[in-house]
Amino acid sequence: MKNPSVISFLIILLFAATICTHGNEPVKDTAGNPLNTREQYFIQPVKTESKNGGGLVPAAITVLPFCPLGITQTLLPYQPGLPVSFVLALGVGSTVMTSSAVNIEFKSNIWPFCKEFSKFWEVDDSSSAPKEPSILIGGKMGDRNSSFKIEKAGEGARANVYKLTTFYGTVGAIPGVWLSAPQLIITKDTAKTLLVKFKKVDDATTATSNLYFPG
């Protein structure tokens, strides 16, 4: 028989998860289906005049050193990006909800560079980080700087458009060092906010299988 204190803790955890998700709604992919932690997705910026490329990929954001990698939008419109999966912070359920903490991890069997780093996203919260810190690869589940939230950013025809937020600010994009490919950063400037959609990998016709270095 399980210890009563353990059972009480599990009940409290489930109750807390219910409270945290009350009033939230499932995040939808481009087909209108809820995001599921068992599936993989391409994160694709909404196309604009200044952002007409493909999906998000890990890439070097400095000339030297290359590591840790950052995240950029591929300049090639036909490249869907590199797949990601989502891990719920509370570990309860499998549907990704708006305003709920998640960890984001790139999924790839081919990872030729920076193998000493994890594939989880994180905010550069180091003392040397600029005012608008970069999103890097090398995060750790449970760490404050590896926690992201998906917030609704569109209605009507743009109902399945979202933005990513963190404890430090909103995920945005600025011209990067390689051919000015949009690079992900944290910003409080709404003009730089990156609007994205999620495309299930099974629904895509092609996939990026290698790390992408603009240039």
Swiss-Prot record:
Signal peptide (from-to): 1-23
UniProt xrefs under Gene3D superfamilies: 2.80.10.50
GO CC annotation: apoplast; endoplasmic reticulum
Location(s) in or outside the cell: Secreted, Cell wall; Secreted, Extracellular space, Apoplast; Endoplasmic reticulum
Tissue: Expressed in vascular bundles of the carpels, the transmitting tract of the style and septum epidermis. Expressed in etiolated seedlings.
Entry GO MF terms: cysteine-type endopeptidase inhibitor activity; peptidase inhibitor activity
Residues bearing glycans: 145
Keywords attached to this entry: Apoplast, Cell wall, Disulfide bond, Endoplasmic reticulum, Glycoprotein, Plant defense, Protease inhibitor, Secreted, Signal, Thiol protease inhibitor
Disruption phenotype: No visible phenotype under normal growth conditions.
Major location category of this protein: secreted
Regions crossing the membrane: none
Residue pairs linked by disulfide bridges in the UniProt entry: 67-114
Any single GO BP term: response to insect
Xref: InterPro entries: Kunitz_inhibitor_STI-like_sf, Prot_inh_Kunz-lg
Subunit structure: Interacts with RD21A. Interacts with RD21B and RD21C.
Family (UniProt): Belongs to the protease inhibitor I3 (leguminous Kunitz-type inhibitor) family.
UniProt function note: Water-soluble and chlorophyll-binding protein that probably does not function as a chloroplast chlorophyll carrier and is not involved in photosynthesis. Involved in the control of cell death in the transmitting tract and septum epidermis during flower development. Binds and inhibits the activity of the cysteine protease RD21A as a pro-death protein. May play a role in herbivore resistance activation during seedling greening.
Name of the protein: Kunitz trypsin inhibitor 2
Organism: Arabidopsis thaliana (Mouse-ear cress)
UniProt gene name: KTI2
